[in-house]
């Protein structure tokens, strides 16, 4: 069984930002679980500008904004599972997930739901 201090379910902008914030506060073992084949969530479809003014002090398209968070995440030791669907979360924070390589059981110290829309 895999064990993580924090497991973030959802690899869109909220999930990426939450994982990065947890890392900045000193959390060591962080996992992001994303059902899609890439991170970024709905932002990858938002081709209009207007993102990033608060966080990055410049106007970005949705994909550009997502890519900033993806790059920041890649520069850390945050683990990512793509193509993985969460099937169950128990009261004891045991997460059952199905990926391309079968079922996984993950023990989370804390879980954060950031599945978006």
Regions found by a protein language model. Name each.
Residues 4-68:
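Beta1-alpha1 glycine-rich phosphate/pyrophosphate-binding loop at the start
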Residues 1-9, 66-117:
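FAD-binding core/adjacent interface of flavoenzyme oxidoreductases
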């Amino acid at each position: 069984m895999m064990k993580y201090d924090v497991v973030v379910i959802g690899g869109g902008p909220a999930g990426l930002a939450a994982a990065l914030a947890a890392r900045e506060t000193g959390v060591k073992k962080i996992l992001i679980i994303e059902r899609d084949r890439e991170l970024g969530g709905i932002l990858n479809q938002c081709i209009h500008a207007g993102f990033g003014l608060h966080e990055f002090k410049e106007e970005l398209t949705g994909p550009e904004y997502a890519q900033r968070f993806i790059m920041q995440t890649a520069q850390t030791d945050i683990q990512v599972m793509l193509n993985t669907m969460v099937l169950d979360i128990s009261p004891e924070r045991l997460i059952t997930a199905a990926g391309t390589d079968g079922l996984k059981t993950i023990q989370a110290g804390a879980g954060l739901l950031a599945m978006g829309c």
